[in-house]
């Protein structure tokens, strides 16, 4: 038809913008969907499904992905984040397309089944995360969890929020007296330390909010003790579950190598391990997802290294050979699905011999033909 003659390729297909390195904290919309799943990733996904399903103590543990630079481990981590944290309606199309083949039926069904029951809330941490001392760990984790909740419009206040402030008032009364004296919003409800402690012990959320505002204004951060930090995380997890949208937390720590290779890396891992072990209790459904270089564990003695691996679904993420055709086809973003499919089928009906030529040396000709056809309109 006349309209088809005037049709441009851009009417049916566009090129995706792709970056050389994947940043989980600064993703483009839908960028995660350009990931090419392979058997290695599917093994990691299967481990994660078994962990989140939480019906087998041996599998109910956090995940640690170790891969050298350029293997796509951060992108793999981002895909796991979306598959377990986005709403099931937002991932269904991707899952049913990526895992449409019969050989993936069990994986596809397992994932959708577990997602119909569970949804995790994502928290991103990256690299050293300004942690110079052990006490900074709880501060940074609490800050990032609160930031993620706030960004999602979720308000949660738990018992440890109040307890830790009361504890700090006892330890540092001078700081708190200065805070009251310099902030009328706070002093109007709590003119002295005794009154402030009493209101916090009674769980007064309005006073807590005024305290937080006063802290922000004065640039003061109260560090939680690590034991309090652990309690706080699981109180937040339980409060989140009660709200009915998310079940628990997925704390993703990319470039975790920086933590492990820091001068206090071994001690930080011990502290994180205490949290990870509590996560393994059957009543909990929160997880760490650590993403690191394999060298991250070289800071530990061999026996401790093997023990650490056993506490996680520890998986090596290597660079697997992926068909160049498949990589190239992921650059395309289909604008008009129906028209694209029509034009593609028409083109290959006319040039069917191309498919035979390029797939004859493949170990999986059917998949190679599929990948080549998805390269249309590149020819």
Q: Across the structure, where does each feature detected by a protein language model lie?
A:
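Conserved P-loop NTPase catalytic core
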Residues: 101, 109-122, 126-135, 139, ...
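P-loop NTPase motor core
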Residues: 32-35, 63-68, 77-192, 318-325
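Secondary-structure transition/capping motifs at alpha-helix termini
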Residues: 58, 87-91, 241-247, 275-286
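Long, low-complexity, polar/charged, intrinsically disordered or flexibly structured peripheral segments
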Residues: 184-233
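Walker A/P-loop-proximal flanking segment of P-loop NTPase domains
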Residues: 2-71, 77-78, 82-85, 97-101, ...
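Substrate-gripping "pore-loop 1 plus following alpha2 helix"
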Residues: 264-274
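Residues immediately C-terminal
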Residues: 71, 258-262, 296-297
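Conserved P-loop NTPase "ATPase switch" module shared by AAA+ and STAND
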Residues: 244-265
């Amino acid at each position: 038809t006349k309209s088809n003659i005037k049709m441009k390729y851009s009417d049916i297909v566009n090129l995706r913008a792709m970056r050389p390195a994947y940043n989980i904290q600064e993703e483009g919309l839908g960028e995660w969907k350009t990931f090419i799943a392979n058997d290695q990733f599917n093994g990691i996904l299967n481990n994660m499904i078994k962990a989140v399903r939480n019906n087998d103590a041996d599998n109910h543990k956090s995940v640690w992905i170790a891969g050298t630079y350029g293997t796509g481990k951060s992108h793999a981590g981002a895909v796991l984040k979306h598959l377990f944290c986005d709403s099931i309606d937002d991932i269904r199309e991707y899952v049913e397309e990526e895992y449409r083949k019969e050989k993936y039926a069990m994986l596809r069904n397992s994932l959708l089944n577990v997602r119909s029951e569970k949804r995790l809330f994502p928290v991103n941490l990256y690299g050293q995360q300004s942690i110079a001392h052990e006490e900074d760990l709880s501060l940074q984790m609490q800050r990032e969890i609160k930031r993620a909740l706030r960004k999602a419009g979720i308000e949660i206040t738990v018992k440890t929020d109040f307890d830790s402030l009361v504890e700090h008032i006892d330890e540092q009364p001078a700081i708190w007296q200065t805070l009251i004296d310099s902030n009328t919003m706070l002093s109007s409800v709590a003119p002295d330390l005794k009154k402030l402690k009493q209101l916090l012990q009674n769980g007064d959320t309005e006073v807590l909010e005024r305290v937080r505002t006063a802290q922000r204004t004065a640039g003061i951060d109260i560090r939680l003790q690590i034991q309090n930090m652990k309690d706080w995380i699981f109180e937040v997890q339980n409060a989140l579950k009660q709200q009915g949208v998310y079940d628990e937390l997925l704390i993703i720590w990319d470039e975790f190598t920086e933590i492990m290779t820091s001068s206090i890396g071994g001690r930080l891992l011990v502290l994180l391990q205490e949290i990870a072990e509590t996560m393994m209790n059957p009543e909990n459904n929160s997880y760490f997802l650590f993403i690191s270089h394999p060298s991250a564990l070289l800071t530990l003695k061999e026996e401790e290294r093997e023990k650490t691996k056993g506490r996680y679904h520890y998986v090596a993420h290597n660079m697997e050979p992926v068909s160049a055709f498949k990589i190239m086809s992921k650059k395309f973003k289909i604008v008009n699905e129906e028209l694209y499919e029509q034009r593609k089928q028409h083109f290959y009906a006319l040039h069917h011999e191309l498919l035979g030529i390029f797939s004859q040396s493949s170990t999986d000709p059917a998949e190679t033909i599929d990948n080549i056809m998805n390269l249309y309109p590149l020819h």
